[in-house]
Amino acid sequence: MANSSGSSRNLTAADWGGFDDNMQSGGGAAVIDMENMDDTSGSSFEDMGEIHQHMKEEEEEVEGEGVPEDGEEDGAFLGMKGVQGQLGRQVADEMWQAGKRQASKAFNLYANIDILRPYFDVEPIQVRHRLLESMIPVKMISFPQKIAGELYGPLMLVFTMVAILLHGMKSSGTIIREGTLMGTAIGTCFGYWLGVSSFIYFLAYLCNAQITMLQTLSLLGYGLFGHCIVLFITYNIHFHSLFYIFWLCIGGLSTLRMVAVLLSRTVGHTQRLIVCGTMAALHMLFLLYLHFAYHKVVEGILDTLDGQNVPLPIQRVARDLPVGPNTVLNATVQVLLAHSR
């Protein structure tokens, strides 16, 4: 009994001893942890940690912001001239590129031959038909007649008239000096074609005629076909009666053709009379000028140029000899005659 009670005590003591050991070890760990802790509550400790962390972050931000501000101030101070120089170069480069684009656009506009292609894109057979039609007056004037909108035929007729005028001046024995004859012929033909076309277009605009400048140039240019025929024949066959016949027949037919076309495109009797009368008068008088007055005008121009280039003739004026030498000469002659006797 005593043994059993003693063993139970020992077992109990052993069991409690293990428990005590565990408690002591756990208690020792608890004491160490508590010693490392501050005498503050958990919430106040966390608040202090957060405040400390916020202060450190603000200091780092201030330091981080302070360095770039100093760098920016230094860059602004040291690189101001560099920035201005780059800006100036960029502006100059933009101006140069803009000017280059404008110049290239203008060059392409005026140098591109495709712009003039529609005005000269015509077949030779079409030109031949239009030349024949320019000698046939139209009968229907109740509706606008069609006008060819091309310049190839009129331009060739103007150059043909220049060649005919040169042929007529050379066949008459006119001496060419310094290209005056060529320049006069080109100026006369092109001046009439462009000048009269512009004047007729101006009158047509005032009289409300339905015609454009291109159509006026084409109409008047093809109207020169009759003039070329008359001048070519009369420069080789010099008969004034023959010229007047061709002037009325051939020149009159080409003029009637132009008048009929203008009549079909003009509304009102007064407007028709002004436009068509002016066109007919200028066209017929120009043919008379080329046959009768053109040669005289050119010869007058050549004579004027010759008079400016020829030097003045040398004039010989008799000079009076002094009286003294004549007296001595006469006395010498008389003495020689007396000795010879």
Swiss-Prot record:
Spell out which residues lie on the membrane's Lumenal side.
168-185, 234-242, 294-341
Tell me which parts of the chain lie in the Cytoplasmic compartment.
1-146, 207-212, 264-272
Q: Where is this region: Disordered?
A: 26-46
The protein's topology relative to the membrane is: Multi-pass membrane protein
Which keywords describe this protein according to UniProt?
A: Cell membrane, Cytoplasm, Differentiation, Glycoprotein, Golgi apparatus, Membrane, Transmembrane, Transmembrane helix
UniProt keyword annotation of Hydrolase present:
no
Q: What is its main location?
A: membrane
Q: Which residues are glycosylated?
A: N330
Tell me the InterPro entries matching this sequence: tRNA_Mod/Golgi_Maint (IPR051521)
Q: Where are the transmembrane segments?
A: 147-167, 186-206, 213-233, 243-263, 273-293
Which function does this protein serve? Involved in the maintenance of the Golgi structure. May play a role in hematopoiesis.
Name the PANTHER family for this protein. Answer: NATURAL KILLER CELL-SPECIFIC ANTIGEN KLIP1 (PTHR15627), PROTEIN YIPF3 (PTHR15627:SF14)
Of which family is this protein a member?
Belongs to the YIP1 family.
Write down what this protein is called: Protein YIPF3
Record organism: Xenopus laevis
